[in-house]
Amino acid sequence: MRLCDTHIEEYLDAGKIVITPRPPKSAISGVSVDIRLGNEFRVFSEHTTPYIDLSGPKEEVSSALDKVMSEPIIIAKNESFFLHPGELALAVTYENVTLPDDIVGWLDGRSSLARLGLMVHVTAHRIDPGWSGKIVLEFYNSGKIPLALRPEMTIAALNFEVLSAPAARPYNKRVDAKYQVQQGAVASRINQDN
């Protein structure tokens, strides 16, 4: 069952879903909560790496990732991060989100931003039961003009579904939970896959 606005507010009041800072009522609509953009970004830096063998030896994958990803870029609240056409950037939500073992979250981009060519999450829009932390966004500008992104602008909507039962292996109890409690624009940790 997908939660409606009334139930989202009840779950927030009860502490079953935790979003910090707590969104105002105006950010909660029919079936979703507006989520804002944080101030940390990462991009692909200039490099000479010809490719990354995603199924290669973990040490080689790790080394390649270190070469291609920038250090975190922190943007002041009144400044903009410019995402140019054809560029991918990682960013992070302003809010921390914590879900219980029986709720899955779904992150959706905003239609108004998509109409300008901004993809807010390239593919990863599921927020697992047991998740806690800031959500990393995978931005891609598929449009034809640069887009100025500002910290704390509304960037996406998060909605929630109640599972048929609590998950037996929620994210916070998995040994391989490589992004649990992330607070920044964490780069890919594919080298930690089993």
Curated annotation (Swiss-Prot):
Which superkingdom heads the taxonomic lineage of this protein's source?
Answer: Bacteria
Organism the protein comes from? Psychromonas ingrahamii (strain DSM 17664 / CCUG 51855 / 37)
Give the quaternary structure: Homotrimer.
Q: Write out the similarity annotation.
A: Belongs to the dCTP deaminase family.
Give GO terms for biological process.
dUMP biosynthetic process; dUTP biosynthetic process; nucleobase-containing small molecule interconversion
- What exactly does this protein do? Catalyzes the deamination of dCTP to dUTP.
**Pfam families per record:** DCD
InterPro entries cross-referenced by the UniProt entry: dCTP_deaminase, dUTPase-like_sf, dUTPase_trimeric
**Gene3D superfamilies of this UniProt entry?**
2.70.40.10
Reaction(s) catalysed by this chain, per the record, are:
dCTP + H2O + H(+) = dUTP + NH4(+)
Keywords assigned by UniProt, alphabetized = Hydrolase, Nucleotide metabolism, Nucleotide-binding
Catalytic residue list: E138
The name this protein carries in UniProt is dCTP deaminase
Q: Is Hydrolase included in the keywords of this UniProt record?
A: yes
Annotated GO molecular function terms are:
dCTP deaminase activity; nucleotide binding
Residues annotated for dCTP binding in this entry: R110, S111, S112, L113, A114, R115, D128, V136, L137, E138, Y171, K178, Q182
Q: Tell me which EC number(s) this protein carries.
A: 3.5.4.13
Which pathway does this chain act in?
Pyrimidine metabolism; dUMP biosynthesis; dUMP from dCTP (dUTP route): step 1/2
